[in-house]
């Protein structure tokens, strides 16, 4: 049975590299068909919504509009790419999913968790990842890494305190959900890769029927 695995984390945590690590590990363990996605974005329409969220505009984007754009982009991706792939036996590895909205818009922006939960239930129902790997990093270190990549986007331009609140919410959410595994992303890249592979090995051991044999 195909699975949906998600990588989460702050800016500079190494999510793109982690997506590759996961895909490579799965390929090495008999998973032939894997599709990688990102949020916001992942489809032509969802990418247009991503641009609105990420780019700096003359007009202020309200936090409520930001939240709704995130979920609009997300449900477009889920319904047009992720669910069809899973139904076709394709594993999906995602760079961000719903946990990002709970952490960024909920923790960082301070939007009420009940409102976010209501929107989530309305558009996603009970759909959720099978496994989430949260890459935990000191926000100051993550932002430093992001700056080294070049020009910052609208969200990356937020104050450090925003990312501290976001990280705190991530950790709270991880502590309450056993399907979310915390990976120390402040380690050297090879150590992060080893930790991700260990988490995958543990998950696949408990779900042996999902690996072709």
From Swiss-Prot:
It is an enzyme of class 2 (transferase). GO terms for molecular function: ATP binding; dTMP kinase activity. CDD domains: TMPK (cd01672). Gene3D superfamilies: P-loop containing nucleotide triphosphate hydrolases. It catalyses: dTMP + ATP = dTDP + ADP. The keyword Signal does not apply. Keywords: ATP-binding, Kinase, Nucleotide biosynthesis, Nucleotide-binding, Transferase. It holds the Pfam family Thymidylate_kin. Its EC number is 2.7.4.9. InterPro entries: P-loop_NTPase, Thymidylate_kin-like_dom, Thymidylate_kin_CS, Thymidylate_kinase. PROSITE patterns: THYMIDYLATE_KINASE (PS01331). One of its GO terms (cellular component) is cytosol. GO terms for biological process: dTDP biosynthetic process; dTTP biosynthetic process; dUDP biosynthetic process. The keyword Protein transport does not apply. ATP binds at residues 9-16. Phosphorylation of dTMP to form dTDP in both de novo and salvage pathways of dTTP synthesis. Belongs to the thymidylate kinase family. This is Thymidylate kinase.
């Amino acid at each position: 049975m195909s699975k949906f695995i998600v990588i989460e984390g702050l800016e500079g945590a190494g999510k793109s590299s982690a997506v590759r690590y996961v895909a490579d590990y799965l390929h090495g363990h008999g998973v032939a068909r894997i599709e990688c996605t990102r949020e916001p974005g992942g489809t032509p329409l969802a990418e247009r919504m991503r641009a609105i969220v990420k780019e700096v505009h003359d007009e202020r984007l309200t936090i409520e509009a930001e939240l709704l754009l995130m979920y609009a982009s997300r449900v477009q991706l889920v319904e047009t790419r992720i669910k069809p792939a899973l139904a076709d036996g394709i594993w999906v590895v995602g760079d961000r999913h719903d946990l990002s909205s709970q952490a960024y818009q909920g923790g960082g922006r301070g939007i009420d968790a009940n409102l976010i939960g209501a929107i989530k239930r309305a558009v996603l129902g009970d759909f959720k990842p099978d496994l989430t790997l949260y890459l935990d990093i000191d926000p100051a270190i993550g932002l430093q890494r992001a700056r080294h990549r070049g020009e910052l986007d609208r969200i990356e331009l937020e104050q450090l305190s925003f990312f501290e609140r976001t990280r705190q919410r991530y950790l709270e959410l991880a502590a309450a959900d056993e399907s979310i595994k915390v990976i120390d992303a402040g380690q050297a890249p090879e150590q992060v890769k080893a930790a991700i592979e260990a988490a995958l090995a543990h998950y696949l051991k408990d779900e042996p029927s999902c690996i072709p044999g």
